[in-house]
Amino acid sequence: MDQHPSARSCSSRGAAPSCESVSGEPPMNLYIHSTTGTRFELSLPAEETVEGLKRRLSQRLKVPKERLALLHKETRLSSGKLQDLGITDGSKLTLVPTVEAGLMSQASRPEQSVMQALESLTETQVSDFLSGRSPLTLALRVGDHMMFVQLQLAAQPSGGPQLQHRHLISRGSSEGTTGLSHGASGSASGMARVSHNPHPHHPHQHPHHPNTTLPSNPAAFPPSPSIPSIPPMYSTSASGHCSPPPQPSQLPGSFLHSQQPSSACAPSPSSPSPAASCPEASCSAKTSGNCNTPLRSRKPGAIIESFVNHAPGVFSGTFSGTLHPNCQDSTGRPRRDIGTILQILNDLLSATRHYQGMPPSLTQLRYQTQCTSPNSPAPSPPPSPPHTTGLTGLPTTVPSETQPTLHPLVQCQSQIRMCKPPGDRLRQTENRATRCKVERLQLLMQQKRLRRKARRDSRAPYHWLPNRKAGRSNSNSSMSSEGSLDLDFEDSVWKPDVKADMKSEFIMA
């Protein structure tokens, strides 16, 4: 049973003689005939399955394997080994592309687009991306829009399983998206691109040697928050809050980086969350002089550390996190599989729900309204909730008691980069805006109904001819007064009163 995976891996890399010596079974050749006229020959191991055959065809034809249907003697191949299905060397298979239409293909498109993009990657592309040798470019389809994403991890140091993520830029027109899901929670439209600028990285790392990676353009991105610290981890290259201690302790299977040189690490009284003032990724358990935050294990996942809106639809940022244990091998290294890439993408999409950064203009407006309101105290910045960190590291390390008293508006503007609005406050603001829109729409609808009623009543026939002109004059005056948008317009409807007056006058006559 151990010979089959080796035979498959060898044949996929092109070392056919070594495969025959290991497996002892010669590969079989299959003739693939497509209904569109394409014919080619495919060599694969004798123990190959239908799923593996579809994967090979998908990589060769650049077509998602879900859209491939294979027929052998008028029998559709769905699962199982090829030998068990009567397929031998020289067999002829018919390839029928699957065509989907209507709403059925729309339902599962977002999930399938990611898997289709990942399954079309070769083993070399996956290995080069996870080792940091080359970037990874994916073409994803979100709804009716195409999005091109390019990711790159730092070169993996010798002996260390750390993956260090670089810069994330997504281009496309998005309405209130969080990158990919402000971007996952909004819809990115048009073209999206994620590019990463490589940064210098130490080729070798010692457990007790401080390793600091400096960004090539530190001002391009806001400083980063804390980084999860269970191995292996993919961390950002943006600058952090505190520098590494002289001798950082070694965590199991991973080495931790800090991204900003010479910055004091002290807990901030304005931030109850330890992650906001001092990242534990650069503080060790043995050195307590600079940081008194206890080192604890963290859950797998990702955190978006910075998010910058460069232009409409063009976003950049950094995120970091730790891989799930299922994506690690026995030595703690990341598995060279598309499942690892899928886990990183899922962590990024999940992190967008916790990220609350927005373009500076919107944030500035919201904080100006919050700081000028009498209910919110201006001198102290609001506390940072879990998974949210300040956008500048140095001001948060200064105790709030030592800060001079400033004008509330000045303090508000200085706090824009120190804290992020809590989720409850954001939801309240959004709910208030939604209610205002609904009330405005209701008012407009009521106004239209009143106009229609006025026009309808003005054209209604009357049973008395002598005063018909007077009735029309009253209706015209009412229509002119309707433009003032009185809410008691119903009280001033003329028809019942006019009819009563008319009847009384008619009787008196």
Curated annotation (Swiss-Prot):
Its main location: nucleus. Residues 1-27, 172-295, 370-404, 448-485 are annotated as: Disordered. One of its GO terms (cellular component) is nucleolus. Residues 28-102 form the Ubiquitin-like domain. It is found in: Nucleus; Cytoplasm, Cytosol; Nucleus, Nucleolus. Residues 176-190, 261-285, 387-400 have a biased composition (Low complexity). CDD domains: Ubl_midnolin (cd01804). Residues 196-209 have a biased composition (Basic residues). Disulfide bonds: none annotated. It comes from the Eukaryota. InterPro entries: Midnolin, Ubiquitin-like_dom, Ubiquitin-like_domsf. Keywords: Cytoplasm, Nucleus. Residues 220-231, 376-386 have a biased composition (Pro residues). Pfam families: ubiquitin. Residues 1-12, 286-295 have a biased composition (Polar residues). Facilitates ubiquitin-independent proteasomal degradation of polycomb protein CBX4. Plays a role in inhibiting the activity of glucokinase GCK and both glucose-induced and basal insulin secretion. This is Midnolin. It comes from Danio rerio. The gene is midn.
